[in-house]
């Protein structure tokens, strides 16, 4: 198995992504099951998927639990729904998909775990010279800063599963620039003012922030 998946005797898996979206795919159905939801997706690489395989959905690592020739299904639990925007999905929604990295592949984005930290709200979209500039605001306080839930100028951040470079970094907001290819091949083409997105902050920054607490 060439997937960058490490299995222990307890069958606990650790997956890694790069924030390079393979496809913006369509939600076929969303089924409520107590506190969980079952999301059925249609995508071009469904025949390559296997049961128990991990796929990032808007940056959230989910496990394939069933599949057909044309669709596959994943389950999002209550904690995931509370922390991400997956609870907003409905039939026809477009979702950014990325399978876990291959050990012999390039790391074209940055290290992404598929563990969303929190959501943010788009507060501005500006088109300029063929590119788009998106501004996002998120909840921020001292405790979050100590956990590494912050951005730095020219650092990396994962927005809806897309690896991006930060500009105009502030305590509770940041901006990213989107090129036409990314705009057209991810669900950034549907993001507008008021849209809720998923954030995963840089894992390197999280570890540095934690180590600084012991200085």
Task: List the predicted regions and their residue ranges.
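Conserved loop->alpha-helix
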Residues: 15-215
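Short, Lys/Arg-enriched N-terminal segments with co-localized hydrophobic residues
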Residues: 1-15
């Amino acid at each position: 198995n060439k997937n960058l998946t490490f299995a222990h005797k307890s069958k606990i898996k650790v997956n890694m992504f790069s924030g390079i979206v393979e496809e913006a795919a369509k939600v076929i159905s969303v089924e409520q099951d107590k506190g969980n939801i079952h999301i059925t997706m249609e995508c071009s690489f469904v025949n390559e998927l296997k049961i128990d395989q991990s796929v990032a959905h808007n940056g959230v690592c989910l496990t394939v639990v069933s599949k057909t020739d044309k669709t596959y299904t994943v389950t999002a639990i209550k904690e995931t729904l509370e922390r991400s925007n997956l609870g907003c999905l409905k039939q026809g929604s477009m979702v950014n998909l990325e399978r876990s990295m291959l050990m012999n592949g390039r790391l074209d984005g940055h290290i992404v775990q598929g563990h969303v930290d929190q959501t943010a709200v788009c507060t501005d979209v500006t088109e300029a010279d063929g590119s788009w500039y998106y501004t996002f605001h998120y909840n921020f306080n001292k405790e979050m800063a100590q956990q590494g839930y912050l951005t730095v100028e020219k650092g990396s951040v994962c927005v809806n599963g897309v690896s991006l470079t930060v500009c105009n970094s502030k305590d509770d907001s940041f901006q990213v620039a989107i090129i036409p290819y990314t705009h057209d091949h991810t669900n950034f083409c549907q993001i507008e003012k008021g849209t809720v997105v998923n954030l995963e902050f840089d894992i390197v920054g999280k570890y540095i922030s934690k180590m600084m607490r012991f200085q």
